[in-house]
Amino acid sequence: MMRALKTWWERRRAKRQLVADDARDLIERDERTAYYVAQRLAARARFRGDGTGFMHWASVAAEVARVSPIAEMDMRTVQAIVDEESARSI
C-alpha cells in the first residue's frame, strides 16, 4: 500500500513539475500572451480528442494565471480562440 501511494505521489509531483516548466517556458517567450497560447493548445488537444493533452494544457493555463501578474486573460479572447480551433478541426 505504501509503495503504491509513493508511486502515485511521485507521478503527481512529476506532472506538476512538467506543468510548471511548460508555464515558465510560455511566460519566458511572451508573458502577456502565455495564457492564450496555453488555452489554444488546450483547445487543439480537446478537438483532437486528446484528453490527457487537454488536461495538461488547461493546467498550464491555470499555472500561468497563478504566477504571472501581467498575463492577459480576457474570456472573450479565449472564446474566440476556442471557436477558431473548433473551426480548424472540422
Where do the PLM segments sit?
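Hydrophobic/aromatic side-chain positions at a characteristic register within alpha-helices
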Residues: 46-49
